[in-house]
Regions:
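A beta-strand edge to alpha-helix "cap/lid" segment located at domain peripheries
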Residues: 2-37, 48-138
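Helix-to-beta-strand junctions that scaffold the AdoMet/dcAdoMet cofactor pocket
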Residues: 43
């Protein structure tokens, strides 16, 4: 019997779990407004990019990190309830699609997000985040 297929499946499961954990760490850092934890999740490079709802795309870790500093200095913290999360791992890249259901003192809403991760020597790092507001259902 060939155990290589089982080994590949175990590797895939471990990678998927690691990507899910890194994705969760991103949202935990966001909720806590923790710049150090947010920095730990991201790849610090020129290829990092971030598109917050209503913003243009930011390129490079400097611009991305500055955006988190500005957002964390905002009026009220956010709580995320994540739904419809799907994870795909292909080699050294992975992506998560997820609906971010937001709760804040100002109200809430839903953002459809895509988070792109790359494998680094010490784990998975977020290299791109894109969030688009979802129109409220009537």
């Amino acid at each position: 019997m060939d155990d290589s297929a089982d080994d590949d499946h175990e590797d895939d499961s471990a990678d998927e779990a690691a990507v899910r954990a890194t994705n969760r760490a991103f949202y935990d850092a966001f909720e806590a407004r923790d710049l150090d934890a947010m920095s730990d999740v991201w790849e610090h490079s020129d290829r990092s990019s971030c598109t917050h709802p209503g913003w243009g795309t930011l390129h490079g870790w400097g611009a991305v990190s500055a955006s988190w500093f500005a957002l964390f200095d905002g009026p009220s913290p956010l709580q995320f309830i994540l739904t419809d999360e799907a994870v795909e791992v292909q080699g050294d890249a992975a992506w998560v699609t997820v609906d971010e259901n937001l709760i804040s003192a100002e109200g809430g809403g839903t953002v459809a997000a895509v988070n792109l991760f790359v494998r680094a020597e010490d784990g998975w790092r977020l290299v791109a985040h894109h969030g688009s507001a979802v129109a409220p259902q009537s």
